[in-house]
């Protein structure tokens, strides 16, 4: 083995040595969605750069902090910034924080992202619960040697996104008056945006939204035995559907505007756990 388990243990031990909190819920915050940490109390903020073996965020809108604290009565660990395959990270590096969260004691993982809408029934600024995913990366975050201390060689993905958590999220959205649809999320390697022809192909495969993250973490979390909820913030319509060219600035601007609804929804879901 390559010492991956031991490295994750060292990361977890460092984090636990800096806080008395023991999180049971983890949150991955996508582009422009890091403001949820403002709602947390009793916070301990640990920069990724300080944690042994942790990768470093390089994309605008990803602060690069692990935040331990209390939210809606639950002890949570929030990843304020994620790692993407297109940044040149290996799949192990992209998903490394999820393994560390598991060793911290996390059993429920809420993954958020900013993505493009393929379903014309979606609109920028709306939220979509992930019901399933389509992995078109040509790679999988579990490839390589398997360590049974983490999970099985061949994990099942029948319910990649928990039916129980999706029901909680639908109930929470209804209570808060937040429009929240459900759909299939497809991952695209990036960093360039998709072509119109690619979007037509993804639509034919059944994708409702598309982005450059989330699926590797989802796979790793299921492998580790975590219950997963995925929430996408639609920041733009996909190529061939949108009337103008895409930019990361546009994504961040819409994500920032929609972050209030996302924060309210995540907070209410965590309250219901």
Regions found by a protein language model. Give the residues of each.
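Short acidic/polar active-site loop segments enriched in Thr and Asp
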Residues: 107-108, 208, 227
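His/Asp/Glu-rich mid-to-C-terminal helical/loop segments that flank catalytic regions of hydrolases
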Residues: 239-273
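Zn-dependent metallopeptidase/amidohydrolase metal-coordination segment
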Residues: 212-250
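Generic non-transmembrane alpha-helical segments
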Residues: 14, 18, 164, 168-178, ...
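Active-site/ligand-binding-proximal alpha/beta "capping" segment
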Residues: 172-208, 273
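Non-catalytic positions within long, well-ordered alpha-helices that form the structural scaffold/packing
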Residues: 102-105, 203, 222
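Metabolite-binding pocket within alpha/beta catalytic cores that recognizes anionic/polar moieties
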Residues: 1-157
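Metal-dependent peptidase/peptidase-like ectodomains
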Residues: 146-185
């Amino acid at each position: 083995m390559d010492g991956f388990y031991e490295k994750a243990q060292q990361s977890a031990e460092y984090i636990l040595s800096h806080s008395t909190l023991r999180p049971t819920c983890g949150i991955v915050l996508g582009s422009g969605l890091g403001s949820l940490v403002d709602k947390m109390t009793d916070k301990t903020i640990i920069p990724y750069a300080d944690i042994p073996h942790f990768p470093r965020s390089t994309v605008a809108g990803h602060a690069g902090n692990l935040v331990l604290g209390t939210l809606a009565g639950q002890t949570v660990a929030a990843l304020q910034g994620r790692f993407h395959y297109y940044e040149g990270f290996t799949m192990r590096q992209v998903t490394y924080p999820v393994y560390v969260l598991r060793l911290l004691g996390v059993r429920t993982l809420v993954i958020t992202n900013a993505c493009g809408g393929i379903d014309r029934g979606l609109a920028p600024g709306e939220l979509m619960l992930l019901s399933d995913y389509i992995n078109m990366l040509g790679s999988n975050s579990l490839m390589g040697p398997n360590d049974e201390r983490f999970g099985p060689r061949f994990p099942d993905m029948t319910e990649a996104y928990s039916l129980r958590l999706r029901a909680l999220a639908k109930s929470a959205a209804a209570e808060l008056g937040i429009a929240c649809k459900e759909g299939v999320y497809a991952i695209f390697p990036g960093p360039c945006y998709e072509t119109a022809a690619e979007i037509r192909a993804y639509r034919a495969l059944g994708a409702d939204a598309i982005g450059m993250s989330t699926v590797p973490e989802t796979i790793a979390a299921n492998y580790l035995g975590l219950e997963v909820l995925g929430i996408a913030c639609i920041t733009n319509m996909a190529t061939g559907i949108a009337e103008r060219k895409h930019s990361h600035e546009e994504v961040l601007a819409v994500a920032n505007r929609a972050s209030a609804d996302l924060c309210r929804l995540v907070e209410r879901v965590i309250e219901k756990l």
